[in-house]
Every structure is written in C-alpha cells, then in structure tokens.
C-alpha cells in the first residue's frame, strides 16, 4: 500500500514541501533562516493572540491594560516580553536571510525575491503599528513622526495623513485602526510566506557555489529537518535568554511613560531594527527627499536582480565583491548606530556619508567590480 503522505491531498502538499523535497546537499547554515522565520511568525501569532485577549485598544486604557497584562495575568509579563523580543529575533533572522540571498545570488529567483521584498515590507508595517499599541511616549511620538512623513507628498499629503489618523492628530481612532492592522497583517504575512515557498519550490533552492543544484540533491527529511531543529533550538535559547535576563535591553525607557501629546521626548527614535532607514531619512535635509531616500533604502532590493553584472551567481569565488559586501554590512551597522544618536555634529556628517556610501555600493560599486572580475577571469 502506498504511504498516506503520498496519496492524501493535503498530506501530499506537506510531503512535497517539507519531507520528500529535493534539496541541495551542500547548503550551509545560512539556509536555516527561512525555517527560523517561520518559527518566529508562529511564535508572534501565538503570543500576540494571548496578548490581544487582555489588551484594550483605547487611548484611556491601552497603557494600563499592558501594565495589567504584566502584573495580573498569569505569566503575562513573559508573554509580553516574548512578543516584544520575538520581533527583534524576527528582524535578526530577516536581515540574515536577505544578507544570505545577496551574498549567494539567490535573488536571481526573481518571483521568490519579489515576494520576499513584499514580505519584508509587510513585516516592517506590522512592527511599526505594533510599536504604537502600548501607548507609551515613544509609541505616540513615533506614530506622529512617521505618519507625518506622508504629508511630504505634494498636493494630497495633508489630507492623506488626516485620513490615516482618523482626525487632526494621533488619537483614539488611530490607535483602534492600528490595532486592527496589527491583528490582520500577520495572517497576510502567512499567506505571502506560502506564496514565497510556492515560488521557491518551482525552482528549487540555490546553493553556496551558485551553480545549478540539480546534480546532487538529497531529501529534505531527515537531513535538513534535523539541521533546522538545531537552528530552532538556538533561536529559542537566544529568545528565552533575552526575555528572561534582559527583557528591556532592546526597548526604549521612554515607552514606560504614558503617552503625553504635550511633552515631546528628547530623542524620538524607532526600534533598533528601523534605525538604519531612520538614519538615511534624517541624512537628507529636505523632507520629501528624505522620505524618498527612506523608501528607496528598502525598495532598492527590487532592483538588485537587474544590477547583476557578474557571470557568476554567487560571491563565493569573487573576493573583490566579498570585500564590498562586507563593507555594505559595516555601512548598515554604522547607519544603525547613527540612527540612535542625536542630530548633532559629528553624527550628522557621518550619517550623510554612510547614506551616500549605501546607495553608491549597491547601485555603482558592486556592479562595476563584478564587471572587473569578469575581465580578470577573461569572461
């Protein structure tokens, strides 16, 4: 009798996606982040659901409802900090996953890559609206500053901002709709992740060498399931360590002060995972220019497959491209640091130089060095 996992309509889909899936034999641990992102998503949805049972999306009670979760709900503090730090782990995995794709040329699977960019934008939107919900000082002022950026759009800007706010300032209507968005977006992300996998399984995975994987494939289970389990255990260990020993390490102390529209915090800044984009936004003296630079800093990912000039897919055997890649990583870390600093000398000029270098590396230097490498190899 044929195994049920190969005949049952539902089991067959799962079997072809996670059990009998042909996988390159030589993929490294950098390929673990896809499954880790799935684990992060499940964790966030479960903890988020438990939090939503006790949270009230109303300006007068939101802050105290979060305090109530932490003080009075059984293990509420644990669920709340798992959710907050889970978001940080989500972004660490996301950035590692994107970095892997850039290094090994996985972006040449264009449909998978484009859905991935959509996923990144959806996760960023979810994290932003979620940060507003505790209704602390940084929640309120972060929402005010970021939504206000839309007013830079010519002609319709102001109307658009007031439409998103549901009034003339960030208030009760804004909080209610942000809670609605924060609840629905993870399910949209889940659907997009399924499409992302669908497109990936059409082509099969890339591998570190960048050459076609068809020559040497192994079944996903048990080889990569056991490997992914190790990654999952390390992720859970890190998340638990962060949650239990340093729950507020990545948060902002200002968010423990209830939102007050009459008092502006000294330094308004987003969570650490948005700081690089925030630094690019602040580096441009013009409001509309800053907003465009902010958008382009993320949307530039869409154009990366078009900027591929190398005859080799992966950077594994391209030392000059590797040097520029790690320069880009260092530049992003610099931007992240600058985003958390006040707007004063020397941070302003360092941020501007790092922003210019970011776009220069992606749009000019990396495609140029790839052409030079082709020449050196007489290709």
Swiss-Prot record:
According to the UniProt record, one GO cellular component term is:
respiratory chain complex III
- Please verify whether the record's keywords include Heme: yes
Please provide the record's keywords in A-Z order: Electron transport, Heme, Iron, Membrane, Metal-binding, Mitochondrion, Mitochondrion inner membrane, Respiratory chain, Transmembrane, Transmembrane helix, Transport, Ubiquinone
Query: Where this protein primarily resides, as one coarse class?
Result: mitochondrion
Q: Where does heme b b566 bind?
A: 97, 196
The note describing how and how many cofactors are bound reads: Binds 2 heme b groups non-covalently.
Q: Which residues bind a ubiquinone?
A: 201
A GO BP term here is: mitochondrial electron transport, ubiquinol to cytochrome c
Q: Where does heme b b562 bind?
A: 83, 182
PROSITE patterns tied to this protein: CYTB_CTER (PS51003), CYTB_NTER (PS51002)
- Quote the function comment for this protein: Component of the ubiquinol-cytochrome c reductase complex (complex III or cytochrome b-c1 complex) that is part of the mitochondrial respiratory chain. The b-c1 complex mediates electron transfer from ubiquinol to cytochrome c. Contributes to the generation of a proton gradient across the mitochondrial membrane that is then used for ATP synthesis.
Other comments on record: Heme 1 (or BL or b562) is low-potential and absorbs at about 562 nm, and heme 2 (or BH or b566) is high-potential and absorbs at about 566 nm.
Protein name as catalogued: Cytochrome b
Upper classification of the source organism reads: Eukaryota, Metazoa, Chordata, Craniata, Vertebrata
């Amino acid at each position: 009798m044929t195994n049920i996992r190969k005949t049952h309509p539902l089991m067959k889909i799962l079997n072809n996606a996670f059990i009998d899936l042909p996988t390159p034999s030589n993929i490294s641990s950098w390929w673990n982040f896809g499954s880790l992102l799935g684990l992060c998503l499940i964790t966030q949805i479960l903890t988020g659901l438990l939090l939503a049972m006790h949270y009230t999306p109303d300006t007068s009670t939101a802050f105290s409802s979060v305090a109530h979760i932490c003080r009075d709900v059984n293990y509420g503090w644990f669920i709340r900090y798992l959710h907050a730090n889970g978001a940080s782990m989500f972004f660490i995995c996301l950035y590692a996953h994107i970095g892997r794709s850039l290094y090994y040329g996985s972006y040449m699977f264009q449909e998978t890559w484009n859905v991935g960019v959509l996923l990144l934008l959806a996760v960023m939107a979810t994290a932003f609206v979620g940060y507003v919900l505790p209704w602390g000082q940084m929640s309120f002022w972060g929402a005010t500053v970021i939504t206000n950026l839309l007013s830079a759009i010519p002609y319709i800007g102001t109307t658009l901002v007031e439409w998103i706010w549901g009034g003339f300032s960030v208030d009760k209507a804004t909080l209610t709709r942000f809670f609605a968005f924060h609840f629905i977006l993870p399910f949209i992300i889940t659907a997009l992740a399924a499409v992302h996998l669908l497109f990936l399984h059409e082509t099969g995975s890339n591998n570190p060498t960048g050459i076609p994987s068809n020559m040497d494939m192994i079944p996903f289970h048990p080889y990569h399931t056991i490997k992914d389990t190790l990654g999952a255990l390390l992720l859970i260990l890190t998340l638990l360590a962060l949650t239990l020993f340093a729950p507020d390490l990545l948060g902002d102390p200002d968010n423990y002060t209830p939102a007050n529209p009459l008092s502006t915090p000294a330094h308004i800044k987003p969570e650490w995972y948005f700081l690089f984009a925030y630094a690019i936004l602040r580096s441009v003296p013009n409001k509309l220019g800053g907003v465009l630079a902010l958008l382009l800093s993320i949307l530039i990912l869409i154009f990366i497959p078009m900027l591929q000039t190398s005859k080799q897919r992966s950077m594994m055997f391209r030392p000059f491209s590797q040097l520029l890649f790690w320069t880009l990583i260092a530049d992003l870390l610099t931007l992240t640091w600058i985003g958390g600093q006040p707007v004063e000398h020397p941070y302003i000029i360092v941020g501007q130089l790092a922003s210019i270098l970011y776009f220069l590396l992606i749009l000019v230097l990396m495609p140029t060095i790839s052409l030079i490498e082709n020449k050196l190899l007489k290709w």
